Structures are given as C-alpha cells and as structure tokens.
C-alpha cells in the first residue's frame, strides 16, 4: 500500500487514514493555497535546522482522496493541523506551544453513497465532498464561536505550564507570557457521520465548565434536524444508524463505555 500511495506523493504529516469503502485520505502541500503570517513555510537555517519561526502557526494542506484501487487521487478540502504558537529561546532555539483553545481540523465519513466531511476550523463551516472530489454541500453557522470564560482561561494556563515542566521555571514563565490566549474558541469540537449519512457536529462538551456535550445533527440534504445533548463530558467512539457509542472518564479515573439509542 505504501508503494501504491507513493506515486501520488510527496505526502505531508497530517491527519490520514482509511475510510469505510477502502479509500484512503492524506494531505499534500498545495502551492495554490496562499501563504500568510500564520500559514508560513519552514526555513532551513545555517545550522541545517528547519523551522517556520516564532508566532502563531497554522500550516494548511490539501486533503486528497485515494480510491480503493489506489489508481486515482482526488483533491478535496483543506486540513489545518494543530494550531501552535512559536517562541524564540536562547541560542536561536524555539519552542512551539499548543494552547488548549487553539483549533484543529476534523474529518469524518459515512453515508451511502459515501461522503467525506471536513471541518477546517475555527469557523462553523463543514464541507461535504463526494469520493470523486466534488464539493457537494457546505454547512455553515455564523457567529458560532464562543468566548472562553475566565475560569477556563486559568485552567488552560495551568495545563500549558504542566506541559512545559521540562523547562526551568524562568524559561517556562517567559514562554507562557508570550503565548496569547485566543479571544474565542473554535466552533467545531468534533465531527462524525452515521452509516446513513447524517452529519453530527459537536459544539460543546470539551470544557469543564460545559455541563453537557452538544451535537448538532444534519440530514443527508443538509437540513438541520436538531441537537443531541448528552450530560457530562464524553468522547464519541462511533455513530451508528440508530445509536451513539461514547466513552467517558468516571470519578475514580476509570473509563466507561456507554451506548445511547437514537430516535428519529
């Protein structure tokens, strides 16, 4: 499979995987995507080290679909990877920090015929693509981004500090002081599709201050069908035709798997 995919390369490091029909998806650099202050390339310095430099970073890549026969590839939407912020350290070194409020892209597939859904983020905008690279529908919800509450901003700072414990205190404090807090959260926190083609878009449930996980549901025609509210914080494992399989952490730090039946 690697040799078959190599003929469509070179591929970039990003989200990739198999789809239910045996297709594969991956990402490639696309010169038609404009460069910007955040979508900037890595540059090799005098020491042979490669870096995109300090500041907010979101490197955009084109998603490609490769057919089950591995004989054709189709370009589709854009994947933005993990948002990061680069800080310059001593001796020309750099540290890249991921803020908990930074956005990431989500990809899901399902339906008959199968479709690929891409939420690039941070806006509430999901593109639905056919398996032959045709953009069939765009689902948008203006003004969907939320402002993070003060208690979540404090938690985010504590989390980032815990991820930088390998640094000495002075360096860690200086790095954290330079990482800005996003003024709003990414609109899409999760994405899934059922075997029958309904699209599920998570918009709440990823912050401790959220009392429940909220998923908007859209029909195969793109129409809004309603929202699903599941109390507490959970991770969606699978969306079936008539059920949701979720996993959540219990108070004693164990994992609990639950199934919820869907009523149409």
Range-by-range predicted roles:
Residues 1-264:
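Eukaryotic scaffold repeat domains enriched in small/polar residues
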